[in-house]
Amino acid sequence: MNPTRQFVSVILVLIALAACTSSTPNAPDQSSGAVGPQQITNATEVIKFDPTSIAVSGDPASGTCAESSLVPGTHRCLPEGGQPTEPCFALGGTRLICRPNPVAGDYAVLISPAAPLPSVPPPSIDRAVIFFVELDSGLTCAIRAAAEPVVLDTGTAGYECATPYTYLVGDATTAFDDSAPQWTTTIYTLDPATGGAATGVAAGVRRVWIP
């Protein structure tokens, strides 16, 4: 073969190889440490309450029940000889558990309705009201249904906590700051001697329950 032609052929082969190499996509950089979706830790858990998750025992009290205006999707019941109580959750059409504590797995009152229960449709997500709260400390608080309001300097207590004289101020939309994955709230404890409240203490919210 003519040396010039041989040289040209070699040059063409080298050019072709260079073109192939430059057109091959770069392999992923294994040292870049690419990371997939991250798990958000400590985010507040919103739980749809299942009344069948709580075991019931004993004889129910007879009472009359109507739809609750405090917690849509639940009932308000009046036991015979007792005080009105809510929220109450139907177990079929024959019994209701009132003021359940999902953390402890118990309830305040078991009701047997004296008349057929009114139809109570489940609330839409924008009308779902938080009725029970567990804070990061383990303290639990339930929505207040008592007729007598508890008024503090910062507002009316919307939730009453397991520790005596301890409250969360505001309703389901104002008592909690849900602007971050972990919600926060403020705890107020009254001095039973003076009726005054100590400065509010910020607290993280671990779990909340809705109907």
Stretches with model-predicted labels:
Residues 12-14:
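Phosphate-binding and hydrolysis-coupling loops of NTP-dependent motor/remodeling domains
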Residues 16-19:
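C-terminal motif of bacterial Sec signal peptides marking the signal peptidase cleavage site
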Residues 27-211:
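Mitochondrial intermembrane space
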Residues 1-10:
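Bacterial N-terminal signal peptides that target proteins for export
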